[in-house]
């Protein structure tokens, strides 16, 4: 069961284009806590034991499946760094939808740093979608720092070194980017 309030549901709709809980694999994070998770026969999601974040493992041969891992912050002053590793097996063709939204109505800055690593096996294809959204009428900043670290040598992984400072007062702001990741094998 997914535990989100109305503000968080609105943010999820912005960053993941979800208006209801998806049928496939997902991991929803809200204000630094797990808000809901579902795995499938082919996609497993586990909480990291040594630091904040998750491991997403996609079995070889998985086709036409997706995993959604949106993050929402609606508490002013919350700052977090999350480490997510994606292990994509051989001959996969999958979609990963990530992103973070911050609704900051307070005076303190709110920040989410998402560090992603992609381990993509031979002949695998990944469509990766990530959006950032900021809203709220508080004076606190909405800071999102997505970063990609290198994965296995099979994968060409473009770096996500953008910083999204979505600090526009009460006016919402949205940034997004899309990547098609292919193994080099």
Whereabouts are the PLM-identified features?
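Conserved beta-strand/loop scaffold segments within soluble protein domains that form the structured core
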Residues: 24-30, 34-185
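Residues that form generic nucleotide/phosphate-binding pockets
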Residues: 14-15, 57
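C-terminal functional modules
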Residues: 2-4, 16
């Amino acid at each position: 069961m997914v535990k989100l309030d109305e503000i968080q549901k609105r943010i999820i709709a912005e960053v993941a284009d979800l208006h209801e809980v998806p049928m496939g694999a997902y991991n929803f994070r809200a204000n630094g806590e797990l808000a809901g998770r579902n795995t499938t026969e082919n996609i497993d999601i586990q909480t990291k034991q040594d630091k904040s974040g998750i491991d997403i493992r996609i079995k070889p041969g998985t086709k036409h499946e997706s995993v959604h891992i949106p993050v929402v912050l609606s508490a002013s002053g919350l700052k977090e760094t999350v480490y997510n590793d994606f292990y994509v097996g051989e001959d996969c063709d999958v979609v990963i939808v990530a992103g973070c939204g911050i609704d900051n109505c307070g005076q303190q800055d709110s920040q989410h740093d998402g560090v992603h690593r992609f381990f993509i096996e031979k002949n695998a294809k990944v469509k990766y979608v990530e959006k950032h959204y900021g809203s709220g009428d508080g004076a606190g900043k909405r800071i999102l720092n997505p970063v990609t670290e290198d994965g296995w040598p099979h994968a060409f992984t473009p770096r996500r070194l953008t910083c999204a400072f979505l600090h526009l007062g009460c006016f919402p702001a949205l940034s997004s980017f899309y990547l098609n990741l292919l193994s080099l094998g």
